[in-house]
Amino acid sequence: MIHISIVILTYNSANYIKSCLDSVYLQRYQNFEVIVVDNGSKDDTVSLIKKNYPQVILIENKDNLGACKGRNQGIEVGRGEWIFTLDCDIILRNDFMGEIIKIIKSVPKMIGMLQPKIMKIDKIRVFSAGIYVSFLRRFHDVGKDEIDSAKFSKQMDIFGVCSAATVYKRDMLEAVRGENGYFDERFFFLFEDVDLSWRAQKKGIKALFCPDAACYHYGNSSCTPEKTRQYLCLRNRYFTLLKNDFIGSIILSFVFYDLPRLLYIFMANPRSLRAIKDIFDFKRS
């Protein structure tokens, strides 16, 4: 039987983790292990897990090491042939794991990333059907905020996957692993899934949207402040481009997409200026 390692991150997640884990353990397909990586929660997250889910493999970090480092820790511990990264504020449909197993058994060898249909918690609107990259290097969640419809009912090739809920082939992760880990730990969080998807694509590893495996996402359970998110988005966007893209495309993107909006961003959030220094430091490294 195919064995899957489910890697879940928590950070002050007591309000969400029980619903998430309950949905995991109610799955009909049970050949999996659950690894929870806690990033220094100050609430009851850890005690709740220890009391109610003794079967969970629990990694306790003293501080918030970020999504990238946390996921990498879980992947390294996991023994599965496939790795399922799962945000703690997601609830799986009861047939989720069974559908994933069907897909794993049927996909071609070059498929290394499976994107479930991530719905918003209202079960009406789509949160993500994968990641799309535009000519000007804007990155979008496919279908974000759209009402679920027939166009999200068929498998389709996609550029990348949303790591809030993605199933990765272990061999694929080993193939793209760099000196900064599977997920690049310099990112902390945001855009790390775009970067990983892009590195995989450059090695000929493909991503597939799998609508029959559905889950439901609350969103932003970490309550990241908007200005922090804005800073990380700007910084990590360019980390991603500098690692993976051609210089001509980066220049086009900067002139026609980023430049017009930078003045507003810097005026509204002076902290974002720090992103410029970080980007130059990243390039030098």
Per-region residue spans from a language model:
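N-proximal low-complexity "stem/linker" segments adjacent to membrane-targeting elements
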Residues: 1-26
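A conserved acidic beta->alpha catalytic loop
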Residues: 23, 38-47, 63
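A short, conserved alpha-helix in the catalytic core of glycosyltransferases
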Residues: 159-177, 181-214
